Amino acid sequence: MPTTLYIIGNGFDQYHGAQSSYSAFRQYLLRCAPEVVMAFDLYWGPGTLLNSFEHPRDIEQCLLNNPKNYHHSNWTVDHLGADFERYLAELNREKVMTLADWYLPKIDEDDERFSYAEYFLPIDRIKEQIHHTTFEMRYRFHKWVNMLHYERGFRKKMLPLDSNALYLNFNYTLFLESEYHIPREQICYIHGSRRDKYGSLVLGHSENPEWAFEKWIHQHQNQRRFRPNLKDKKGRWYANDRLTYLSYFLEDKTRGNWRLPIRYYAQEAIREAIEGYYDNSLKRTHSVIHQHQSFFDSLKEVRKIVILGHSLSEVDMPYFDKIANSIIKDQVEWEISYHTPTDINRIHHFCKRYGISAQPTLL
């Protein structure tokens, strides 16, 4: 049985010159599917991009016209370029509800001008945009992975890896096989690989939807705009009619200031779409671990673990929990690579979490 385990992260491919950072993926999206980044600006994150528009038609112009000249919000630049998997858990409920409210018809069902087509259109439009953005992002991500390659001259930098060791690969690339000639049967592609069919790569956020929902409610319930009564510009009080408040913070929905009945039915449909997204975009790590149980069972004889290019991010901690429970910790030597001084701090926190000591090595 192999006694060495290598854990391979994205920094390993970047060390060899692959442009595999999330910021590089963002640049790829801007070239090939800029509308995905635009939609990400509109619906994800805590920013207030909607405040830049006076009318929904301006948003349509944003999404449809001059995509390459589009001005992206700072939030998207910082976070879609840094760790977009984590921020897939940042679909902004308030943004979505506000945008839906803008689109909804402002007349009652009894009005002869009322059209159910106009009622369903904004609901379907927003649901479709959210679905399309997440589907397209997964599809484009897989295409981008297939395009990754090492830079010329990378062989001069190749590392002395043990060809008899086991490999837990968090990357989707096949460079361990193609360039280091590690046998496929010794590699566990924990999130899938580029050879898999499109749409099957494991990609998503790790926050439990129920826990994340309760956290969001707790963070926002005391904010002024979500209080039962608000003041208008003339200082007069009125019952809060914001769709986000009515949908998420009003306990008795029958007493809400809905203005029009269709707003009640619309918020139900939109809320269902939002919460369904959170559940569907969850990276189900425990299910992934179960699928690869035989690999983790094979770690009992491991006496050395080498982590190369992994960020040790929270989203992947369940895998490290499983590793820690699959080995004899006091008999294992750890070696963890770093790239910046910040990485060393992360290594210290990691070691403290698992009660181990590790030798940091520069990659």
Where would I find each of the regions flagged by the language model?
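An N-terminal structural lobe/cap that precedes and organizes the functional/catalytic core
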Residues: 1-39
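SIR2/sirtuin-family catalytic core signature
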Residues: 1-16, 163, 274-363
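Hydrophobic/aromatic-lined pockets within catalytic cores
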Residues: 16, 30, 34, 177-184, ...
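Short secondary-structure boundary/capping segments
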Residues: 19-29, 182-186, 322-323, 352
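Short, highly selective alpha-helical patches that border small-molecule cofactor pockets
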Residues: 22, 56, 176, 320, ...
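Hydrophobic, Leu/Ile/Phe/Ala-enriched alpha-helical segments that form helix-helix packing faces
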Residues: 29, 158, 176-180, 327, ...
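Short, conserved aromatic-histidine micro-motifs
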Residues: 30-45, 334-340
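Extended, H/D-rich, highly charged conserved domains that either
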Residues: 39-271
